[in-house]
Amino acid sequence: MVEHDSSDESVNRRKYLKALTVGAAAGIAGCTGGGGTETESTESGNGNGSGGSTDDTETSGSSSGESWDSQLEVLHGWAGGDGEAAVTALIEAFEEEHPEMDTNFQAVGASANVNLNATILRRLANNNPMSSFANWPGKNLERYSGALMDLEADVWDAEGFKDTMQSRAVELCKFNDKMPAVPIGSHRMNNLFYNTAVFEEAGIDASSLDSVDALLDALETIDQNTDVTPMAQAMVAPWTNLQLWAQILTSQSGVEAYTNFIEGNPDRAAVVEALEALKTINENYITADASSISFTTAGQKVISGKAATIHQGNWVYGMFRADDSFNYKEQWDWIPFPGTEGIYFYHVDSIVAPSNNPSREETIAWQKFVGSKKAQIAFNNPKGSVPLRTDIDPSELTDFLAMTYEDLTDSEAYPPTIAHGLAVTPKTMGACKTAFGDNFMGPFNVEATADALVAAVSE
């Protein structure tokens, strides 16, 4: 899951968390499975069953799929781009297994996690939980503290997921002595995608790009030797700068420097060095409309040949794959972000269940399915991510994802992403985004941004 919008905090999170605390203390009683009118959304589902139960008691539906008493309501942010085809495939696969279950899958808004998180927090604060919702695990779950269901016995232990999921994903799905989430897929973050025709025209050998300096030299060569913009960048929201800066920091100063930063021991000199390199890129080598476009528009510039390269998570592959005229190893190719060879920058999407669940048995059946081979293959192939199960046959994935899956299981280091909820708390992540949003969207104030980043992780 990835963010698309122009702002990173459109809700009063403190107000909602206060309400959550009150609700948790009161047992969050009296909730229902409705609430679809609280936000603009796109709904899908089979429409079977009762249309959602308002009974406060636990449901008694069979987890074998023989009978169900309540509607399964799932919120997600995959409203378009890389995610729409993936979640559609996931829903279709689930409904094939449970055709008699009444389901309601809602894509919330067009701004992915921002609107989604606002809706989830509002629903939980109003004692109106949904069955499940898509979200990042790890420290991101702190925003929902006190309102999460424990799936350990009914899902994790019952299905043996602790033995079949990658251990890092298992740990990320633990929170406050519970396991409220099941991972659905992983995106690799440290990617550099490029248009092969543009690189060939400029005389760039992608395999030679082994450092940030080498990348900068290549961007300058493209700028001088072609009419193509060297790099597509999307700055309609600050997370893209934060994400790219993290790759540069790791490339220049190593995984240890990045780890020290997210753990609250930043090396300011390393922070500044990475910002200087990012400033060079943003001032000289990106499209003129970068401040107003999303990553999907930026990715289209690489497809059309208007931009030579782009750094993004491999959700961009999901977008590339949807274009039959833009093929891997032909029109486009990939390398690890220069200087991060042997590293898998770790991102995880998961499905989370809230407590006082309005459809307990249906939710358990759904969460079990999310962790199954069938679900993980159906979802990840179109998404551009890879399954987190360790027993997947790579031949069931596309060639690019089979390669990524091998890297997922056999890399030297797995630093967690700072821009997508795993590495730091929501408060710290928000402060890091604000550091870029306030100081690094043009003009690019290195010193002020460095001060704000250091302060964000040092509090």
Curated annotation (Swiss-Prot):
Induction: Transcriptionally up-regulated by both L-arabinose and D-xylose via the pentose-specific regulator XacR. Disruption phenotype: Deletion mutant shows decreased growth rate on arabinose or xylose. It cannot grow on low concentrations of arabinose or xylose. It is found in: Cell membrane. Its main location: membrane. The chain crosses the membrane at residues 19-36. Pfam families: SBP_bac_1 (PF01547). InterPro entries: Bact_solute-bd_prot1, SBP. It is a single-pass membrane protein. One of its GO terms (cellular component) is plasma membrane. Keywords: Cell membrane, Membrane, Plasmid, Sugar transport, Transmembrane, Transmembrane helix, Transport. The complex is composed of two ATP-binding proteins (XacJ and XacK), two transmembrane proteins (XacH and XacI) and a solute-binding protein (XacG). Part of the ABC transporter complex XacGHIJK involved in the uptake of xylose and arabinose. Belongs to the bacterial solute-binding protein 1 family. This is Xylose/arabinose-binding protein XacG. It comes from Haloferax volcanii (strain ATCC 29605 / DSM 3757 / JCM 8879 / NBRC 14742 / NCIMB 2012 / VKM B-1768 / DS2). The lineage of its organism: Archaea, Methanobacteriati, Methanobacteriota, Stenosarchaea group, Halobacteria.
